[in-house]
Amino acid sequence: MKKKRILMVCEAFGGGVFTYVSQLCNDMVDEFDVYLAYSLRPQTPKNYTDFLDQRVHLIEMENVGVKGLTNLKSDIAAIKELRQIEKDVQPDVIHLHSSVAGGLGRLAYKGKNNTVVYTPHGYAHILMGPGKKSKIYKFAEKVLGN
């Protein structure tokens, strides 16, 4: 029987999110074809591939997370990139990790015939405290959650 394909999308590939997503990919690789689309950050370990099972298919993203969720030109490029990755991988399930990948991914895959799961992890709007950026994230979470 053919394995189902899981596409993990992770912009915040560092710290606790890195540990969580790496372990999740490794735990799933026996039963699923796992694809990990990620963006490198300063917090990403230099030897990050050593933490991942060799059967995990790695896709480094160029546009996702470059400017967060507040730069329209960057966001459009990121959405196009996410749609191309989805087209290439043809996943059965897409699992979005953290706020930026969650926001852009839900925009990119809205209206598509995909099963999309979102895990926010750090809750960016809470960590930012009061202010304009925090309100944008809260609004985006509310709109995209429906």
Predicted segment positions?
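A short acidic, helix-capping loop that chelates divalent metal ions and anchors anionic groups
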Residues: 66-70, 124-129
